[in-house]
Amino acid sequence: MRIVRPSIAVCAILVCVNTSAPLASSPQAAHVPQTTPLILEKDEGERRIVRGWPGHPDPGETFILKVDPKNGGSSHLVFMTADIRRGGAIDPHRHPGADEILFLESGTARVHLGDTARVVHGGSTVFIPANTWISVDNIGNEAIRAVAVFSAPGFEQFMRETSVLEGEKNVPLTKAENDAAEKRHSHAVIYKEP
């Protein structure tokens, strides 16, 4: 019994000393966003509409940013949904710093992935390794509901800059604005020149 009491006393002293000492924070910890668990219904999230751009003056597709550094605080991935209207497309582009998984919930599309082209239908999954060219054309009679997951944040910042929140005035981007946004976010997305 005598051995146990000194051990308990030493432990109690160590606990008191450790709880009264200020914790040193690492510089890296200051930049980690606060994560928040989320449960979102189909149409919940940050709803946005792509602004028109040179050669495409009409407002673009509707998309929803569901999980990213701003929504949920994820520092590791981005999850979004988008509707590709009948006759619409995702223009040829690549993501230098992130893999992407594209899941087409509905519709019919012609997908160009690297050197491969294929017609796919609702329920199809497309894995797009970083730096691989991708484009999608809606060739069906209905809108395509698409889900995209990126392995690293970045692209969502470009999407925010080139869109407006649903309900806001949607003014097309000027050529200068579009070029500046593409240059600023070239680490996350590069579009093929027409």
Describe the predicted segments one by one.
Residues D115-N131:
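Short acidic-glycine-tyrosine-enriched beta hairpin
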Residues F63-V67, M80-H95:
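Conserved short histidine dyad/triad with adjacent acidic residue
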Residues G97-A109, G114:
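Glycine- and acidic-residue-biased ligand/ion/polar-headgroup-sensing regions
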Residues S74, R110, A130-E156:
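Ligand-binding loop in jelly-roll beta-barrel domains
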Residues M1-A9:
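Bacterial N-terminal signal peptides that target proteins for export
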Residues I8-N18:
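Bacterial N-terminal signal peptides
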